[in-house]
Every structure is written in structure tokens, then in C-alpha cells.
Amino acid sequence: MPDYDLYYWQLPFRGQFIRALLAFAGKRWNEYADADIAKVMSADVADQAVPFMGPPMLVDRRSGAAIAEMPAIAMYLGETLRLLPASALDRALTLKVVADANDVIDELTRDGGRDMWTPARWHEFKPRLGRWMRIFEETGRRHGLTPDAGFLLGGRRAGVADIVAATLWHTAADRFPVIGELLAQNASACAGLARRLYAQPSLANLAAVTRQQFGDGYCGGEIEASMRRVIK
């Protein structure tokens, strides 16, 4: 029996972070057709499992708890699946990493398609994307991360910060190889972390299933079309 119900569009993008955390922890979950998600999303807030504007939304089938907003879901899963570090500082840094990842994908999609990518906009954005990569890289290096070993916030095993960071860069680089090239130039340790985690059976299987289900899809819509015209 599935452990969770995940409401997210049939694309990787923001939902992929939640899928990765569940897969890494060996959990099973249901997903739903886009029409079903739209129905849940548009319901009166008094009738929603948790009042929310848009997906992802997760329901823990064991407890009935419902959570929306990607960072909140990630931290809930980290807490309940024992994927968070012990110290208050490292938990706060975990949340920072998750929030940073959320910011990066928003910027990659021009804040959800506020406007479309053009060659000039991409040229202007590339240094900023490189800086984002170096922010993740410096975070890891301050905690002993190298291209071949270690974790983003130190410790002996991967946690929410590692899984989210690896998923951010692995998914973007897989869909847009030029992003992978930029990552190798700016954040070799993070690139190594993503390779190592996505070589593990749980995440390797997730990547394969994602490819089978969604093909080359990343975020969908006109914004993805503009990304594919320009980010190459």
C-alpha cells in the first residue's frame, strides 16, 4: 500500500524534489492525473486537505497529515524519515539549501513564465546561474565535500540537503546539457555529489522512471519551449 499521496503535475520540476526524497527513503506513493490535481487545487479552501494555492501537496496516508509548499514538504519528510542533521544550525542550513533550490528553479523558468527566454536574457543570466552554483559549491566545501566524497553539510550519510541539491542539478543538467557543463566549471564537488547520489539504486531508478514517464519534459508549457530554444 502506498505511504503517501503526491499531488504534482506530470513533470519533474518542483515535484521532483519530493519524489527524490520519497524514493531515497524507500517509500511508495500515489500520483494523480493533471485534471485531478487541477480539481483539488481549485477546490474551496475549506474543502482542501490543507489550504494551498498550487502543487506540490503531499498527504501522509498513515497520519492523514497534509502539507503544501515544496520546502515545507521537504522538511516534514526530513523530520519524519530521519533525513535531517541533529544540530539546530545544520537544520537551518538544510532549509536554506532547499529554499535556494526553489529559487534557482524559479529563476530558470523566469518566475514561472513571467516572460520568455531570449538569447540576450540567457547571456545576461549565465553569470548569475554560475554564482548560484558556486553558492552550493562553497556550502559543501566548507563541510568537507569533494568531487569524490562527502556530503553538503558534512556528516556520514546523505540528508535532505544532499538529495535536494543533487536533484536540482542532476535534473537540470540531464534536460539541458549546457547547464551540466556550467556545473562542471563552477561546482565540481556538487556535480560529483549529484553523480554519486544518482548512481544509487533508489535515485537511479527514479531517474529512469521519470525519463520513461515524462520524456525530456522539465517544467512544461511555453517557458520550457523558450528554454529549449535558448539554453543550448
Predicted segment positions?
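GST-like domain detector, emphasizing the conserved glutathione-binding G-site
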Residues: 1-127, 224
